[in-house]
């Protein structure tokens, strides 16, 4: 860890006492900052509150008083807090810098950074690359949006390690000097319009991952979307991946995977299910090769890696019915991949937070959907979608209720699929919690 001096004696406001806010506050305190933590909820009964106040850190919960901005030189914002918060808007008029904690991770780390973002596939790719590193000479440390606070992991990472960092658009909006040696963008489609306001703002946020890169760095990019790069001043070397074309990078030719002209593995030896996952595999191979991982470690991983929890996860088979948990599908593209993975009659559980999106992108993916079980804020939109396509549907209270109601309709040889196409935050704190509710109820059948 680099012991930087820039925060010594500076007044820093940490917005949000979640996992990242807690670790950020402790780090800034150790770096000599005068730290105040603010959360919109009453946090006075939490263990984090007790620990931070015992350290001498001020913690204010329940509201966001504008007086907190007096003499503040920096705000470290929880990525989920919108920029429309009045405190943030006032800070912007005062030209107070606003960052997310991944910027702090970059400032203190001695490690190389491999940053991964994208609308879909980023968690799978991050996990896959992490597994490829496990047998490698140097450590690949997972952090960021995948659940391990980046600034905490960075404190213990050495100069020969690599931070394999999953990055959301929310996190990338709050970077200033952050520079990954290898940046990987899986794809960019419509998402998070409630947060970003419009599609262009969302694309711009994703492309932030490239803004400080130089000609010494790499950008791994989906060949299907290469025209997006025309609107940005990309200084890094671009390496493409494609399932359809021979490209400068990772590609498939006659069911064999290549990196440039080097053979890596036969497609038949890759165990990760789903045609869409071939793009994730190619992106991961490109990153691993650029990071210096040997082919044997890459191939060993691809022959054993079956996927991640809550992403097309097989839960169980009961009375001839197979149950799949795809709670991580928080947008229509991810759900289209899930629906396309099955040909059997499918009972589809869908719904959640209304981000302003429609569901018309799923029009061509639902021929085999036998029944829909709809819950959450998007109930009205999804019932209209079901009616338009003449799909029988049942309105449910939540995921647990939806699983219970499938029993009235499902038959042997069919599939029950939770693939919500929506974020979870209207009813569940995370997609993981939503998925666990599904799993728990399925196991009671």
Swiss-Prot record:
What Pfam families is this protein classified in? Mur_ligase_C (PF02875), Mur_ligase_M (PF08245), MurD-like_N (PF21799)
Q: What InterPro entries does UniProt report for this protein, alphabetically?
A: Mur-like_cat_sf, Mur_ligase_C, Mur_ligase_C_dom_sf, Mur_ligase_cen, MurD
Pathway noted in the entry: Cell wall biogenesis; peptidoglycan biosynthesis
Entry keyword set: ATP-binding, Cell cycle, Cell division, Cell shape, Cell wall biogenesis/degradation, Cytoplasm, Ligase, Nucleotide-binding, Peptidoglycan synthesis
Q: Which residues form the signal peptide?
A: none
Q: What is this protein called?
A: UDP-N-acetylmuramoylalanine--D-glutamate ligase
- The kind of enzyme this is, by top-level EC class, is ligase
Q: Which residues bind ATP?
A: 118-124
Q: What does this protein do?
A: Cell wall formation. Catalyzes the addition of glutamate to the nucleotide precursor UDP-N-acetylmuramoyl-L-alanine (UMA).
Q: Name one GO biological process term.
A: regulation of cell shape
């Amino acid at each position: 860890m680099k012991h930087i001096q820039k925060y010594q004696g500076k007044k820093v406001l940490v917005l949000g006492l979640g996992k990242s806010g807690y670790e950020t506050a402790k780090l800034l305190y150790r770096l000599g900052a005068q730290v105040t933590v603010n959360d919109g909820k009453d946090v006075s009964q939490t263990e984090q509150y007790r620990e931070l106040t015992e350290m001498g850190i001020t913690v204010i919960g329940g509201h966001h008083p504008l007086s907190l901005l007096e003499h503040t030189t920096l705000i470290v914002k929880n990525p989920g807090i919108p920029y429309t918060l009045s405190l943030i808007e006032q800070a912007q008029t005062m030209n107070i810098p606003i960052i997310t904690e991944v910027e702090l991770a970059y400032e203190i780390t001695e490690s190389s950074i491999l940053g991964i973002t994208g609308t879909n596939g980023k968690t799978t790719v991050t996990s896959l690359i992490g597994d490829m590193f496990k047998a490698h000479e140097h450590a690949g440390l997972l952090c960021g949006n995948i659940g391990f606070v980046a600034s905490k992991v960075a404190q213990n990472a050495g100069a020969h390690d690599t931070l394999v960092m999953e990055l959301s658009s929310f996190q990338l909006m709050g970077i200033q000097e952050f520079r990954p040696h290898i940046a990987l963008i899986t794809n960019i489609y419509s998402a998070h319009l409630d947060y970003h306001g419009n599609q262009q703002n969302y694309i711009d946020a994703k492309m932030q991952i490239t803004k400080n890169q130089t000609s010494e760095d790499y950008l791994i990019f989906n060949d299907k979307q290469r025209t997006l790069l025309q609107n940005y001043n990309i200084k890094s070397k671009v390496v493409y991946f494609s399932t359809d074309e021979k490209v400068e990078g990772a590609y498939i030719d006659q069911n064999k995977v290549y990196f440039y002209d080097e053979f890596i593995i036969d497609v038949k030896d890759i165990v990760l299910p789903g045609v869409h996952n071939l793009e994730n595999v190619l992106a991961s191979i490109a990153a691993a090769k650029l990071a210096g991982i040997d082919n044997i470690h890459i191939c060993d991983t691809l022959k054993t890696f079956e996927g991640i929890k809550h992403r097309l996860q097989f839960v169980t088979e009961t009375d001839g019915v197979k149950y799949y948990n795809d709670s991580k599908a928080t947008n229509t593209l991810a759900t289209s991949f899930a629906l396309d993975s099955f040909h059997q009659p499918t009972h589809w559980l869908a719904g959640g937070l209304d981000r302003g999106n429609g569901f018309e992108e799923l029009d061509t993916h639902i021929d085999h959907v036998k029944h829909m079980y709809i819950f959450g804020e998007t109930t009205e939109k999804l019932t209209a979608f079901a009616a338009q396509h003449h799909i029988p549907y049942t309105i449910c209270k939540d995921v647990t209720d939806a699983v219970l109601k499938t029993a009235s309709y499902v038959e042997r040889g069919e599939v029950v699929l939770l693939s919500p196409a929506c974020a979870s935050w209207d009813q569940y704190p995370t997609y993981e919690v939503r998925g666990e509710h599904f799993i728990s109820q399925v196991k009671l059948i």
